[in-house]
Amino acid sequence: MVQKCIKSVVEFSERPVIKLDAKSVEKYIQLPNDIRQKYTSGKMSDAALSDLIRFSLLEHFGGTWIDATVLLTGKIPEYILESDFFAFRDTFGLIENPATISNWLLHSVPHNIIIKEAKNMAFAYWRNEEYVVDYLFTYMILQIAYERN
């Protein structure tokens, strides 16, 4: 399924698509030693590391992050690609949660203040903690960064 999703992103994208793995991400960013050590020791999940990578890449380079499990059925609209910041908002049905900004597709220009603040909050959190406080943690920090800016 993941390969089908990746193929759909390549098919419908009019911009270069960079597929990341543990090795290729090192060409673009260097994670701090304490974060890498926390991850390799098992005190940080793959999802948490992915969030730090996502925010770091977007803050530095800008662009569009699409999770590997997103199946595109058409081109990404220009209004998304031309935005300084774009994220989908979702009320999650009846779930009581103040975080409504999703992270599975994010777009930003380089050095976007919302992405930068979310990145800084995520790194500060993981430097001091060893487990995620809530499944929607990343949505929460995106919501906070968005509301503050």
Q: How would you describe each model-predicted region?
A:
Residues 51-63:
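Small-residue hinge/turn detector
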Residues 1-51, 68-149:
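Glycosyltransferase-associated regions of secretory-pathway enzymes
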